[in-house]
Structure formats: C-alpha cells, structure tokens
Amino acid sequence: MSPAQPVGEPLPGMGELPAQAAASAPDGSERPFSVYLHVPYCRVRCGYCDFNTSTNLTMGQGASAEDFVGTLAGELRAARRVMDSVGLPVRAAQTVFVGGGTPTVLPAADLVSMLELVRECFGLAADAEVTTEANPDSVDEAGLAALAEGGFTRVSFGMQSAVPHVLKVLERTHEPARVPRVVDWARRAGLSTSLDLIYGAPGESLEDWQRSLDEVTRIGPDHVSAYALVIEEGTRMWGQVRRGELPMPEDDDEATKYEMADAALGQAGDEWYEISNWARPGSECRHNQAYWLDWDWWGAGPGAHSHLGDVRLWNTKHPVAWAGQIATGHLPVAGHEVIDAESRELERIMLGIRLREGVELASLGNRPDCPSADRPDRGRATPPHLVPVVAGLVGDGLLDAGAVLRGRAILTLRGRLMADTVTRALTR
C-alpha cells in the first residue's frame, strides 16, 4: 500500500465541511453530482501499481473485505449528514464508479449493496451510468449478470496487453484469451464494456503493441482507455529499473505507440474524446467527464478524494485507520483545501485542453492574474498577450488552425503528445 498522503488541513470537529463546499459553479449554476467508491483490495499487487491498494483482505474488524460494505455505509451516511449541514442540495448521483484495487474481489452482491447505499444516501438518477472496474480473471458470467441485474450499466476490464510476455512484466495474472470471453459475458448481461490498456512496458516492441491493438479492435468494446506506463518511485517496478533489471520506457517509443493507438482505434470507429480515451459515439465515460467538467463528487473508501464546491477533500489512506475513524463517528477525511479562483481557472484550462472540445480562447483571460484581465473585451476575444502564443502553437502544429478560427484551442494529434507544453504556453 502506498504510504504517501496529501498534505492539507484536517476538518474540524467530527468532520464539518467549510462553507465553500456549497459554492455554485463559476457561472452560477448547480453542479451535477457523482460518487466514487474505492475498494482497496487486490489478490495480487502489480509491480507498477502505486494506487492505494492492499493484498491483505483480513485487516481486522471494519477494515476487512467482508466488513467493507458495512463500514462504507457509515461513511456515506456521514457524508450525507455533513453535506446537509452546509446547505448542499440533495442531488441524485448522475454517475457512480467503483474503482480500486480490484472491486470484483468482493462478491457481486456486495457491489450491488454498495450501489443501494448510494441510492439511499444521495439518490440515483434514472439514467445513471454505474461502472465497476474488474480484472478479467476476477469475474464470471453469473457475477456479471448479477451486477447488471443489480443496477450496474458498465464494466471496465483491465486488459493492459494481449501479449503474454508483456502481461508477465506487468505482473498481470490473467491469460490473454480470457479478455474476449469476459467481454462477451458482459455484453450478454447487457453491460457496456471498456478495456484499459498500458503501453510502454519494458520489453514491449512496436509489434507487440500492434498485436494488442489488433486484439482490441477485433473484440470491439464500446470504450478504450490507453495510458503510457509511468514508473512511480517506490513501486516494485521502479526498484527493478533502478537495479538495471528492466529498462526505463523511452519517450519516443511511447509517442509512436500513442499514434498507433489513435490510428487503429479511429479506423475501428472509436473517436478520441480525451487524450487517453476513445469511444464509440455515445459511449463516452460520463464519470470521467465529471472530473474534467468540474462536477461535484463524493469519494468514499480509503484514500478516496472528493470535490464539493470550492473544496477538495481526501480520506485517510490505510483501511484500518479509515475504518477506525468511521467507527467513532468521524468523517474519515485526512485533509482538505479550499480552491481559490486562480487555481480553479488553471485547472479548468489544464483539464479542458485535454478534451476533444478544447477550451474557448476568449475564456483564457478569465484568470485573476491574467496580464490583460482588465481589458474591455474580456471574455469575448482572445487575450491580446496570447494572440502571438496561439499563432505560434498553430505554426508548430500543436493547435488545430480551423478550431482557432472558430475561437477554440483544440489539440492536434501532435498537440496531444505535448499537452503539458500547450497548457504552459496558454497559462503564462
């Protein structure tokens, strides 16, 4: 389990929220609401993983896998109480995402019970998107059918690769042939399907990656996520690289593999809607969009993060400490921060530029520290100090020229590979 914990002020008392948690969106509208549920358990911890997970499923009363639903109920009910206390309106969850860890380590009945808790505490929209993550070898046909019957609409499988030696390096436990089987089971149950891929694993050739892409397009899921491998300090893979047992991924190799993914998925009918995500039209992950579009969400479970109004919160990471706080009636929040206007605008630009819709050029002058913030046409035209910057980004092939003429900053394929560079240029 990763020991790192964000630094921030704890909440006062038993977990009272600051008044800024009830802040409306910058345009004055009420934010939609989502729920994230973090299940921290895994049968095996992958060598590259730095998520808040544990292979110990029996950590004591309240923190063990068999007690998880009961402890989660305590957090969700406390969350509803503190949200009421600052005047946050009751809003039915538009999306629910169960992540981990490996949520499907728990029985399907437990996951359905968790969804019922969300319905009890917040309500659930009639057309809510309800997703669980799953490993291909952690589900069976009956379990997927039970999830669909219990209200889940979507399952995201951690495929990562279709090549055995790559899966071995990543320390994944499933066989490649398992993936099309579980996708077929999910479809029969009426669930929408997503496959997660990782590219850039040590020893993965371009031919290996193409083989994985060919298998994905053959299976034909509704949604695909593809992420470059990041070797985080402190992980087992980081130690292997440091000792020279595995090579460090190369940036040029990862860029080529991203371009290969975009070409293969586009040819198969999947459209990119965020740098790392492609989907059939209408199958975009709405829960992901909640993060990118500044919705409110409550994150429950060890180490989960929440966002309410102008406040970010994060839970205690260790399941034993998390469960102990809930048992004593405390909201298990380890820290929080209040987001100021400048930080919110920077985040809006940073996240928005990653989307297919990009960001409105005129809105780039809305930051309080913008050099031309006091100009008369603020909000209606590209800030004057950014006009040459935008022209330069178009000239470098990073922004779409046609989109700029329509008043929007939208990344080209090359720009997607250099999104951080574009963001820095637009926020200087």
Please place each PLM-identified region on the residue numbering.
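Short amphipathic alpha-helical interaction segments
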Residues: D374-G395
